[in-house]
Amino acid sequence: MKDTTVPLTLISLLADGEFHSGEQLGERLGMSRAAINKHIQTLRDWGVDVFTVPGKGYSLPEPIQLLDADRIHSQLDSGNVAVLPVIDSTNQYLLDRIGELRSGDACVAEYQQAGRGRRGRKWFSPFGANLYLSMYWRLEQGPAAAIGLSLVIGIVMAEVLRKLGADKVRVKWPNDLYLLDRKLAGILVELTGKTGDAAQIVIGAGINMAMRRVEEDVINQGWITLQEAGITLDRNMLAAKLIYKLRAALELFEQEGLSPYLSRWKKLDNFIDRPVKLIIGDKEIFGISRGIDTQGALLLEQDGVIKPWMGGEISLRSAE
């Protein structure tokens, strides 16, 4: 990965939303205006909108709040949280270090160069706009005990966001958060471990907070940001609250499985009792969503018969 020191220093100087001349920035960083312009282009490549106004210099459309390790740690009583300005993927960062991690260790990033979603899809991750968070957990009972884990993560994230004012956030089976029927956040659970061994789990989450411009071919479904819904949250506070609540939820999940979460899912289910379609490969199955069963499988009603559906290749969409 190329050195990102200069662009990161630039973004910290521009974060106040004021104009800064190329000359001033060059003096601060000990380089020419032409060199500054080159690094500004790197910021644009990261998805940052930088305005250039002749005679005034460079500015961001509005101030941005950068992630701060000290502020996050000050709200937690234990565990490690790495703050990574630029990374390929937060999940990959933890997967690469799995031998040195303790349950509950986490990382957050400003920008993911290769963020990924379910089924290997690319996850669009512009700099400083959203919250990208991953956490490690060792599940002693093994991989089979992880069934339903993405549902638990979704419930906890939705409950945290609702308490902070985003009270219309809901969950979508098996791994998304929805707001006003559009995707607000995605969850990716990756695990390694053989039957009989402990499961090494990395949980990743991306929450759309204030996404700026986006190419339509990058995101293949309707999406929304908290900002668009009129909700502004402190990213450092949100990261700390999510990490705290997820650690507690994973301990409970280890002891009691999915059962403490079933009624909580029902209250938050975006598609309960609504017409939906399941996409399995190139096949579409239509029915009425009736929630989840005790294993976390989706319950789909067709012609008065309710059947559970489970599997990594199933997508759920509204059929309304």
UniProtKB/Swiss-Prot annotation:
Occurrences of domain BPL/LPL catalytic (ranges): 66-254
GO CC term, one of those recorded: cytoplasm
Catalytic activity: biotin + L-lysyl-[protein] + ATP = N(6)-biotinyl-L-lysyl-[protein] + AMP + diphosphate + H(+)
Amino-acid positions noted as binding biotin in the UniProt annotation, renumbered to this chain: 89-91, 112, 116-118, 183
Recorded superkingdom: Bacteria
Any one Gene Ontology molecular-function term assigned to this protein's record: biotin--[biotin carboxyl-carrier protein] ligase activity
Alphabetized SUPFAM superfamilies for the sequence: C-terminal domain of transcriptional repressors, Class II aaRS and biotin synthetases, Winged helix' DNA-binding domain
InterPro entries from the UniProt entry: aa-tRNA-synth_II/BPL/LPL, Bifunct_BirA, Biotin_CoA_COase_ligase, Biotin_operon_repress_HTH, BPL_C, BPL_LPL_catalytic, HTH_11, Transcriptional_repressor_C
Function: Acts both as a biotin--[acetyl-CoA-carboxylase] ligase and a biotin-operon repressor. In the presence of ATP, BirA activates biotin to form the BirA-biotinyl-5'-adenylate (BirA-bio-5'-AMP or holoBirA) complex. HoloBirA can either transfer the biotinyl moiety to the biotin carboxyl carrier protein (BCCP) subunit of acetyl-CoA carboxylase, or bind to the biotin operator site and inhibit transcription of the operon.
Protein name per its UniProtKB record: Bifunctional ligase/repressor BirA
DNA-binding region: 22-41
Family in the record: Belongs to the biotin--protein ligase family.
HAMAP family noted in UniProt: Bifunct_BirA
EC number of this enzyme: 6.3.4.15
Pfam families to which the protein is assigned, alphabetical: BPL_C, BPL_LplA_LipB, HTH_11
GO biological process, one term: regulation of DNA-templated transcription
Keywords associated with the record: ATP-binding, Biotin, DNA-binding, Ligase, Nucleotide-binding, Repressor, Transcription, Transcription regulation
